Swiss-Prot record:
Signal peptide region: 1-19
Region (Disordered) residue spans: 80-100
GO biological process: inflammatory response; positive regulation of cytosolic calcium ion concentration; positive regulation of flagellated sperm motility; tachykinin receptor signaling pathway
Keyword Ribonucleoprotein attached: no
Function, as annotated: Tachykinins are active peptides which excite neurons, evoke behavioral responses, are potent vasodilators and secretagogues, and contract (directly or indirectly) many smooth muscles.
Location in the cell: Secreted
Propeptide: 20-55, 85-100
Name of this chain's protein: Tachykinin-4
Lineage of origin: Eukaryota, Metazoa, Chordata, Craniata, Vertebrata
Membership in a protein family: Belongs to the tachykinin family.
Main localization of the protein described in the UniProt heading: secreted
Disulfide bonds: none
Amino acid sequence: MPSSVTLLLLMGLSVCTSAEDGGEEQTLGAEAGPWVTVTLEAGAVASIQLQLQEVKRGKASQFFGLMGKRVRGYQMGQRGLLGRRASSTKGSVDEDQGAE
């Protein structure tokens, strides 16, 4: 979805800049409909791809942050309230507490 929005914005910008370059206003007719093509420079494509990667990375970190998982790798054990791993067996006594 974000890539299609970016493409539409670029199409609008390219039509505006080509109209300014020619000195006369160019309009798209009904016959041009689905056959409108956009030519981009290699540098522009690379920068757009970098921006899309940053957006995807940001959304992935938001999602995994909300779900309690790490982005890089899978966390095997559940974390307790104090940041320590919870024991995998129920009813066992932690070594930190000991018998009092």
